[in-house]
């Protein structure tokens, strides 16, 4: 999250090129040439003892001899001198440096040196960066790029060069083009925080191969994606590709889960990547998902329809009003439908008429115009007609329009015209639909993230009991627990298991079966055989003592022959569950090396591969997120939506997944959990067979999670002056209805003091932003009073920290009819304690001069109060920790 030094890197006022040269093949020559050719409006200072001047610019022999401290330095010398030069730059006071090449053995010393001088590093082994709005080309790339609104961040120099070459041909612009290299210091999450606030950037494209800190990435990406679309292409999906890239980037389904959870969109290949660049550069935001297609041929429209159907897209339905208008505007033989086929003899005038009618319609959310090469309607004329229609129609600049001019040579000029006009253009109908669905999926992801979670039925969570059971098992030397041993842990979290008994041998198994009644299931108990069915270690529907005796003896004999080294700890005996009409599922928790615990849902089997047979999500889960996981599993055919007799209880399964998530979040000792099978019968879910892997854990239990969970430890009961008890706790996404009810009981005057303007209505998006917070970046405490009838919010206080965790902006609001009870002071004191404990240096706020209550409270709590009557504000500031 740190933004220290990024301003100097991405908006430098002066640059020093260390190792500048007049030899054309040297890096120092290429860097100087590109910096000067880019039109950088600031001093560029070559540093070299070998030349008096480089490319006409006076050179300086050493870093120490520079006339002033550069904002940015670029190391172009032999990598062996990196540490020596970095030390000199640090002593000079330089705050940012691009390292073009280095060896891994230098990395610790380089990082230590940079940290000592509070210097930020881009690279090593970085291609450099381009910032066209600053006229900055601090890279090896000789390709000039245009100014634009798209930022591109890449972990690959080869991919960077490819995109640059492709963009130059299409005259496509960028706000920033940054090659990270090995990301020794500055990483993708730092840049996401910067670009999220950059006014020149409206969309972001990422090429990633690995992550050093998944939690910081998810946090930064989620924050940035609330305001700007972010697309990701991730290589290294296969083990072979990861080996080639020398990167252990984790399981590919984990990336999908993280990207979706952060509200981003993933593209799968370079073809989609190029389409995505075109889309992000030109397409307007979607207001919905319904697509209208206009074409001069049935075949290309059919190809577009097929792709739309395969990707679960939506076709717009035309109203009678629109149909009548089209009939009047177009020749008699044109069938009025969607797609609208203007026929192969359609002229440019027909295109213009059709588009003008459709621009008056509200029936669709995006318009796709397709043109196939035709003698009757040359591509360039039709393109000009479309551009003219959009230019002169009042709604032309507000409608999302995509163009597909088929062909290559005959359509080149048309595509150039569209690019100049700021319209996205594609070469094939399928590619156009792919691009459209990218934006649809992005919109869906954002919409899902903002939905208000439903409150589940009462959730069971006896964390202390679960911890005690797991710790006892660890103290006993256990690394794996079976169904019998893990059942009390699962029951502590409301997860039902089938009663299970342990039998030492076949005779005891028969005795247990006689006691519990037939039929029974018999299972092998061995920590060395994870999949019992591989050795026929599971026998079902045993109905007599003889069958139990025979099955038990045969099972043990088979294992001794097939797995002579395997430890046998007896047998498990269970009553047979009623499987009639039931569905067998599998829930697995695995630990990913990058993203930590993953929750997987599938139908299972012996050869179970999560990549192919499971839907995956990151904990923590609420009811909405769990429901998305279930629906995703059904949609992608990982599980069936119903059994032979009844539909799957999605709400019930979602609640079970939330319980599993809570267990994993609360108990870091759990390394792996495999519930297989999980029997789903109506609204009942029963774990029939469970394996749990565990290991001792010390340190911060949340550090292993890619997303910070709800901080239960911050809950606190408080007694108000009137004697009422209320709970101070962090805000939850589920609080949205209560927050809206709370705001309704705050007077307009108090709301004006809080928001500095009159607000007639808070939208769902407003409330979602207030309740669905990232606990790593901000904190909001609510005071909640609960009675037998209802639970209500009485007050809210909030602090949002800057990315460097130095300053935080605070606000506090109490229900207007509850003033005088000390609630505002207690809430603000809790917020002060929280921000101080998290290392923040200052807590800042603003209010109005006539808000005497807030000003008085701030003074009592030690805030500095600065009344600025001319501006009509009062600045409040409280020092927390020394910098």
Predicted features along the sequence, with ranges:
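A short, sequence-level motif marking secondary-structure junctions
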Residues: 543-545, 693, 731-734
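Acidic, glycine-enriched active-site microenvironments
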Residues: 674, 693, 824, 828
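Long, contiguous binding/interaction regions
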Residues: 698-883
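Short, basic/aromatic-enriched C-terminal tail that caps enzymatic domains
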Residues: 691-693, 878
